[in-house]
Amino acid sequence: MDFPQHSQRVLEQLNQQRQLGLLCDCTFVVDGVDFKAHKAVLAACSEYFKMLFVDQKDVVHLDISNAAGLGQVLEFMYTAKLSLSPENVDDVLAVASFLQMQDIVTACHTLKSLAEPSSTTGESADASAVEGGDKRAKDEKAAATMLSRLDQARGSSSTGPGRELKEERGGQAESASSGAEQTEKADAPREPPPVELKPDPTSSMAAAEAEALSESSEQEMEVEPASKGEDGQEEEGAGPATVKEEGMHLDNGEPPEENEESAGTDSGQELGMEGQNLRSGTYGDRTESKAYGSIIHKCEDCGKEFTHTGNFKRHIRIHTGEKPFSCRECSKAFSDPAACKAHEKTHSPLKPYGCEECGKSYRLISLLNLHKKRHSGEARYRCGDCGKLFTTSGNLKRHQLVHSGQKPYQCDYCGRSFSDPTSKMRHLETHDTDKEHKCPHCDKKFNQVGNLKAHLKIHIADGPLKCRECGKQFTTSGNLKRHLRIHSGEKPYVCTHCQRQFADPGALQRHVRIHTGEKPCQCVICGKAFTQASSLIAHVRQHTGEKPYVCERCGKRFVQSSQLANHIRHHDNIRPHKCSVCSKAFVNVGDLSKHIIIHTGEKPYLCDKCGRGFNRVDNLRSHVKTVHQGKAGIKILEPEEGGEVSVVTVDDMVTLATEALAATAVTQLTVVPVGAAVTADETEVLKAEISKAVKQVQEEDPNTHILYACDSCGDKFLDANSLAQHVRIHTAQALVMFQTDADFYQQYGPGSTWPAGQMLQAGELVFRPRDGTEGQPTLAESPPTAPDCLPPAE
């Protein structure tokens, strides 16, 4: 017993599995779009895939450069339909030629020949031949013959631009023609309509089967020329595609400067295509380039909405903690396939294929071949902003995101965006905080064994990335290249403003911001801007209280890795900073700077009772306690009528006066001078005044962040202790200004004036809100006299 519909139903089921991403063992990634498929179907339809999969290669680099063409070819493999139009014929032809699918190649050539413009508008297709008309007439004759056979097989005599062509299929399909009739009417459009290519039945069973397929397909899909704005539109490719086993996502494209290849990721963005409908019963897990549907998937946990089932599934794993993707080498689990693939690549960090022209090495021979196009002149896509050349238009488009500032690749975990998929993949690894792989040489830890292997290169005596001058090891060729400039003295990057030269382009970029005043890295909490991202990161951690760097020996935490490294030197008693005068060594340069004061004779810390100077603040405090019995320098302050008394002693003036500087979005707390004198003691009054002012501000606005401000450079801190530690870099300026009238007034500069009758005794201070005394000048309102101080970069 025969079942005529069986083969059709099997193919339909395979197509549904492909559209839903079920049981697919192969995935293409072209221009950021995933194409899922079955190896068996690919091998049955393409001689190229048949030979490819016989070799059992898991990851193969293909020279396929457009998503639109690949989508049409895959659609043909599973549905026996090929929607050709003048807009997509070049894309389809390029893919079909590469995959050795001769039937599609012939159909594309036929359509292109029919699409050539006629010499006379009103003439029929037979009489409107252009140059090379003999060939075209031959093609049209062949098309007419095929149409006649198709009409006989189907029992149909339908004509017109919308007819569907069928081709005979015996293992491999025969060539097919376009859907335009040879005897087209004069008033019909000259541009041939889209063509649907179907198999021709060769038996009665096949005829019935094809008839049913034809009827269902006519109801299912309306054939139209590709329109702009849809996902299926013609688009320049982004570079070679990658075929691999399911769950492994590799992007196409040219290898970046420091990495052997770019790995594709899912952007995590909801690319809504409003008003466009998916074919009934499909969900599109970022599949081929068709219009996405209006199906909305809403997360019940957080309310986030998605139009792609695949992105929705990946997002759900954030809440469930599911990690279905595992490394084939070490079995480590991941929730995102892109992160898994990035991890797997670290198991084989060697790059055996080297470029003879420049020496750059790659992991895959296909990537080396792509790179060689730069030297051969095939890299014809040039960036208009920086002049850099690319071998594919897709790579150029991704590169231009750097100049435009667009960041289309978003992390599903934290929402952070990236301009390229490789950066996103590296970022995904940071969400895996388990660092169980420890370096036996330096105790450094890694969350992946591949990263540990790459790190071990620096300990190998004869590693592949070793500096021949000093023997230092590196994990990437780019880092070694930059390091070699230290020995050669090469500084190829020149500032156009001051002609200063730099060995690294990033250093030049940061330097130029000094001239332009650009501070692109802005804190979203307080609005402060920085010239570089590392300074902003350190600053934001002051707001959040985050201290991610922990000392394993004592448990102390730090904001920056450089602070932790400096702290570890104390444990190891490493003192790299030596005094040039006495050779005494110090852990950090700050301690050395304080020590040098001994040799220079500078005494910035003054007693305002007797005027004696000291080179250290603790010596000043000791002097006050012993010589003046701890009472010297107490300032007797007379409050204004109805006000409160606040007292500052010399003993605590050095620290408390700087700690007292505070700022918020609501009010400014600062030190101001007053007129007469009353008796009081103890500095706790000043602390109480600070607490009262802070409490008042927070009562008015509970969301207010109290920031303690440095009067010299304007930097703000979350607590007074941090401010006090920071202020040491200003020593004479920030501290001495409280000691004498002259120094105090100099802080305002020659252009500032004081209200008449306000000559004060030295160091008399009171702590008040800025708006507490109208018209009275404050330190915070004075122009800064010290240069901007940025937090140290990591």
Swiss-Prot record:
| Location of region: Disordered | 116-285, 769-794
Zn-finger region bounds: C2H2-type:
297-319, 325-347, 353-375, 381-403, 409-431, 437-459, 465-487, 493-515, 519-543, 549-571, 577-599, 605-628, 708-730
- Using the UniProt entry, state the residues involved in the cross-link Glycyl lysine isopeptide (Lys-Gly) (interchain with G-Cter in ubiquitin), renumbered to this chain: 388, 472
Molecular function per GO: core promoter sequence-specific DNA binding; DNA binding; DNA-binding transcription activator activity, RNA polymerase II-specific; DNA-binding transcription factor binding; RNA polymerase II cis-regulatory region sequence-specific DNA binding; transcription coactivator binding; zinc ion binding
Q: What happens when the gene is disrupted?
A: Mice produce inviable embryos which are severely retarded in early development and do not undergo normal gastrulation due to massive apoptosis of ectodermal cells around day 7.5.
Compositional bias of kind Pro residues:
784-794
What CDD domains does UniProt report for this protein, alphabetically?
BTB_POZ_ZBTB17_MIZ1 (cd18206)
Q: What is this protein called?
A: Zinc finger and BTB domain-containing protein 17
